[in-house]
Amino acid sequence: MRAVELLLLLGLASMVHGLCSPTVFYRDCWIRRFPGMLLDLEESQRLGAQFLKYYSENTGQKCGRSCCLRKDVSCNVAVFFHDPVHDNVNCLHVHCPTLESCILEPGASAILYNITAGIDPDLLVFEHTSPIYPNSRSSSEWWDRLRILKAMSVGSEGVYPDVMNRMVPSTEAASTTQQDLGANTGISYSRKSTTDVGLRFTSANVSTATKVNMVSPSTDFTHSPGNKTISPFFGPTDTRVSQVPSRSRLNISKPSVNKTKGSHSRNHSSENEEPWDGAPASAGVWLACVTLGAAVISLCCRVVLGTSRCCGKRQGWSHMGQRSASGCRRNTLKENS
């Protein structure tokens, strides 16, 4: 019995762990965790990664949040080691300017945290602000591919860089700088920003992010054919240009844009669908009421018929008893006479 209970508890824990989202929001930062992954620090430093801090922390959550709270430098990667190599030093902070500068490898006793700037989801819902971070599902798919390829190349050395070179897009389109993003507008601005967002690991300058937010996009930019945002390899970034302009910027009427629905193609049918949604429910209620009433009426009729039959039978037996008694009296009188 104890073994069965233990198995049930383990299964419940695995289900709860699967339901938990790997991405959380904390202090204007999106923190995405990748269990079983760590960073090859030496190789990453050769490719341009910057070592920031290596210290002791209580939990992996605090390690990732402390990387988010760093204001002196831009910290976008944190690695927490459950089994520290050195004296209780288990938290590593690194800044990776590009995707190619971070070389990852599997590690059973480590958790990698990707920290990117973002907007509070409550503000996105109640203030109708367009999302700046991309879909996390595409990022998780890239990471699943990375884990599979890395697991295949664990036994041999020198295979992982080749896999990364085939898997990661080229860095030629990443030549656009943060200042170009803040200065350009229109269609040319959209093409540069989307390609740069797709290849950068995170944004390294907060001032340029404010410049991007201050630029008001035009209608031509919103409907331009080249405005296709490429999902980054890691989590959300803070410089992605909004695909749907806000209501305060372009002054669009309500029937054309309905941001609470989440899809532009469903706006024309959202108001007409409400009566149809309530009709089946009301019909079901009426049908249940009619069926219940018919059942009650039939039950009452059966009860009345049953009681009437019982009363008739009792009256018949009483009449027969009276007749037999009167016949017996007559016979006795005749015999006595």
Curated annotation (Swiss-Prot):
PROSITE patterns: MANSC. The chain crosses the membrane at residues 279-299. Residues 1-18 form the signal peptide. Residues 33-113 form the MANSC domain. Residues 300-337 are cytoplasmic. Residues 216-230, 239-260 have a biased composition (Polar residues). This is MANSC domain-containing protein 4. Residues 216-277, 314-337 are annotated as: Disordered. It comes from Mus musculus (Mouse). It comes from the Eukaryota.
